[in-house]
Regions:
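Nucleic acid-machinery interaction/catalytic patches
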Residues: 1-263
């Protein structure tokens, strides 16, 4: 906060023109409180806050699309309701187990399995993996004696997932994780083609999501963009600091804070 305020505050606008991408809603609240404390400690009666967008949570609400791309978010298919997905997966699991001649699961156990399958689907979508990757040779080698049981479980998962994807296509919907990836990729393309006229900073955002990583790469290369990674080692050697370039420090007052060759 102490670095963002002097760098991005503008007379009459405060930080209102700054877009700040943060990992979660909790981080946004913490930063809001930090901005307020900073203003009070510096004897300021008030400060226009930056626009903060939580991008790290998997279960993001519909505000993400409007925040990143207000003109194009409507072109992306809507996300399915998570409860509807959970209950649909429950029914698909029962049908697929019956088709395989397996013993029926009690209702609660089947719902728990449906919840775990939904989480696995989300993780695969976030990391842009397919169900086939779960029974690749490197994975099976790690499982040892459990490999046969694993293959049976993955076959059930693959069948349920295939039917669920067909159901989504029929509804004209996508999983929430898929929609999030599409929103990130659309924002990355638009910002790369037409950089926003205001500063954009991603602060403390780390994720296994490849789409989010692609967006962060674009932000880092924007004329007024920056990516602030967490856990910066303040005890790095002078050689490491030199490799970082300006690291956000202008050579002269009012000068550029980042150079093209900065790490």
């Amino acid at each position: 906060v102490a670095g963002l305020v002097p760098r991005y505050r503008e007379p009459g606008f405060g930080l209102a023109r700054l877009t700040l991408l943060v990992p979660s809603s909790r981080a946004a609240r913490t930063l809001s409180e930090a901005f307020i404390r900073h203003a009070g400690e510096n004897g300021e009666s008030g400060l226009l806050m930056p626009r903060m967008i939580a991008v790290g949570d998997l279960d993001l609400d519909e505000k993400l699309g409007a925040a990143l791309d207000p003109l194009g978010a409507a072109d992306i298919p809507p996300a399915c309701d998570p409860v509807a997905r959970w209950l649909t997966l429950d029914g698909l699991i029962a049908e697929e187990r019956a088709a395989e001649g397996m013993e029926p699961l009690p209702g609660r156990a089947r719902l728990n399995l449906a919840r775990e399958m939904a989480r696995t689907m989300d993780r695969l979508l976030v990391e842009e993996k397919s169900p086939e990757d779960l029974w690749s040779e490197p994975v099976l080698d790690q499982l040892g004696g459990l490999a046969v049981h694993w293959q049976h479980a993955i076959r059930l998962f693959a069948r349920v997932n295939a039917r669920w994807q067909a159901e989504l296509a029929m509804r004209g919907q996508v999983d929430a994780a898929t929609r999030r990836n599409m929103l990130f990729d659309r924002a990355a393309r638009r910002w790369k083609e037409a950089p926003p006229p205001h500063p954009v900073v991603a602060a403390g955002v780390t994720s296994a999501a490849l789409a989010l990583a692609r967006l962060l790469r674009v932000i880092a290369e924007l004329p007024q963009g920056a990516v602030v990674l967490p856990d910066l080692d303040r005890d790095m050697s002078a050689e490491a600091w030199d490799e970082l370039g300006r690291a956000g420090a202008a050579d002269e007052p009012g000068g550029a804070v980042f150079a093209a060759d900065d790490a």
